[in-house]
């Protein structure tokens, strides 16, 4: 099994995760549009379009896990999330890597009961529907 961890995104969550993994002795590849990310001897930073599955596979032919820590601008979710999510899912399926997603609760929409995983995905807005579709496809 590969010890490589692919972290996509270098915001607060992605950078912190990459540093934690690297400090634990893991090999980490951080992929962003610009090639940014934390500096560490166990971290390799790469600039790439993560919606391109073939590029992800070229960068990391195998991995223990791929971590989705990206978030396109809200006004571009409907256009940008579907190909990114499909690429991550395809990567996990082809490599056997675990797909870990840093997400939010938008897919559920407004609720007036305690939130649990069994709540239906009833998002009324575009972004919530995009998020719900990503979850549905990843199940």
Please describe what each predicted stretch is.
Residues 13:
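Hydrophobic/small residue at the entry helix of a nucleotide-binding pocket
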Residues 24:
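Conserved dinucleotide-binding and phosphotransfer motif residues
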Residues 10, 33:
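Cofactor-binding loop segments of dinucleotide-utilizing enzymes, especially the Rossmann-like FAD-
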Residues 36-95, 108:
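NAD(P)H-binding glycine-rich loop region in Rossmannoid oxidoreductase-like domains
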Residues 27-29, 86-135:
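Conserved Rossmann-fold NAD(P)-dependent oxidoreductase catalytic core, especially the SDR/UDP-sugar
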């Amino acid at each position: 099994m590969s010890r490589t961890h692919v972290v996509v995104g270098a915001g607060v969550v992605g950078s912190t995760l990459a540093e934690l993994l690297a400090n634990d002795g893991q090999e980490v590849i951080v992929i962003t549009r610009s090639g940014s990310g934390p500096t560490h001897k166990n971290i390799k930073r790469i600039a790439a379009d993560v919606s391109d599955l073939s590029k992800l596979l070229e960068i990391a032919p195998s991995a223990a896990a791929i971590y989705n820590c990206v978030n396109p601008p809200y006004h571009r979710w409907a256009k940008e999330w579907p190909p990114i999510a499909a690429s991550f899912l395809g990567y996990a399926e082809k490599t056997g890597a675990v797909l870990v997603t840093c997400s939010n609760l938008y897919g559920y929409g407004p609720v007036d009961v305690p939130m649990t995983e069994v709540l239906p995905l009833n998002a009324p807005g575009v972004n919530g529907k995009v998020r719900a579709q990503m979850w549905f496809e990843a199940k």
